[in-house]
């Protein structure tokens, strides 16, 4: 055993790290019933030995969809039974391991940022259309979910996140070259050459890329091009 840090503080806060598979789940509550829009794999990468891994890829649909969908939906159904929510957005971030079941990280009445594009790419399910229908034509929401099957994606998709150290951007050629890959649906490069990376600024990442493929296996191959 090796000591990583020392402190002379009288109290310390210890947080357990969950090493289970992580998921992002987006749903819509209609008449007190949870309707699943999507469940994605939320993947992380250890960039420095001994440090907590950072979020680098969310994949739609999850490869564990059939294992987690029913139990995760039941969790949200029980949740709104207590809160009284009858309609609107409801999302959950959770962990799952075969021997431990589901462990909830967060439940919130919102959709996940930078992910509504993926429901459209993968399923043809438009979050924008859902919200507009909620405001103006609620009857159409029922039709949207009647036609939506989370087990029948038309594509496989992912958003790739790139984070960086607080240094000056010297060269963005590689970032723009990656944006030209055929699998890229939408690139989002936040910094220009010469700009300084700010920890708490207007830019959440160095760059992100929405990519798609016909199969999960092909999506894995395309992803490796970005992280070589």
Question: Which residues does each PLM region occupy?
Answer:
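Short catalytic-loop micro-motif centered on adjacent basic/acidic residues
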Residues: 13-15, 91
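ATP-dependent carboxylate/phosphate-activation module, predominantly the ATP-grasp catalytic core
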Residues: 16-22, 26-85, 96, 108-135, ...
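Short secondary-structure junctions
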Residues: 5-7, 83-85, 179-187
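Active-site-adjacent "lid" and substrate-binding segments of diverse enzymatic cores
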Residues: 86-92
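Conserved protein kinase catalytic/activation segment
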Residues: 100-103
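N-terminal beta-alpha lobe that positions the nucleotide/phosphoryl donor
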Residues: 1-13
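Peripheral (often C-terminal) accessory segments that flank ATP-dependent C-N-forming ligase machineries
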Residues: 133-228
């Amino acid at each position: 055993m090796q000591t990583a840090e020392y402190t002379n503080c009288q109290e310390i806060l210890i947080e357990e790290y969950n090493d289970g598979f992580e998921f992002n789940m987006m749903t819509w509550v209609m008449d007190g019933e949870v309707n699943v829009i999507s469940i994605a794999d939320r993947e992380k990468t250890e960039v420095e030995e001994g440090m907590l891994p950072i979020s680098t890829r969310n994949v739609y649909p999850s490869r564990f969809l059939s294992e987690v969908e029913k139990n995760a939906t039941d969790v949200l159904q029980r949740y709104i039974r207590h809160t009284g929510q009858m309609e609107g957005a409801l999302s959950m971030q959770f962990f799952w391991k075969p021997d431990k079941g589901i462990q909830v990280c967060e439940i919130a009445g919102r959709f996940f940022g930078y992910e509504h594009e993926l429901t459209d790419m993968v399923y043809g399910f438009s979050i924008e259309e859902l919200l507009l229908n909620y405001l103006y034509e609620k009857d159409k929401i029922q039709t949207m979910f009647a036609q939506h099957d989370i087990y029948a994606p038309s594509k496989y998709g992912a958003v790739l996140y790139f984070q960086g150290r607080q240094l000056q951007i010297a060269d963005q050629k590689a970032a723009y070259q990656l944006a030209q890959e055929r699998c890229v649906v939408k690139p989002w490069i936040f910094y220009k050459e010469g700009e300084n990376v700010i920890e708490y600024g207007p830019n959440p990442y160095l760059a992100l890329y929405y990519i798609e493929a016909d199969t999960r296996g092909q999506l894995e191959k395309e992803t490796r091009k970005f992280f070589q």
